[in-house]
């Protein structure tokens, strides 16, 4: 009887939990699909946007500015 209870618990509780798709996985897949549907120019703009950096203000500048901005 104990073996049957263990088998029922595994198949009715643990197996469905292991096969559920987590909600956290959904946005990543949706983002990848939306990104695939973008034009190459839009994709390029998104990829290059984080690299763009404006000049810092002279008041904030310390000796760490290597780009000659300060």
UniProtKB/Swiss-Prot annotation:
Residues 25-53 form a propeptide. Residues 1-24 form the signal peptide. Pfam families: Conotoxin. Disulfide bonds join 55-65, 56-69, 61-70. It is found in: Secreted. GO terms for molecular function: ion channel inhibitor activity; toxin activity. Belongs to the conotoxin M superfamily. This is Conotoxin VnMLKM-01.
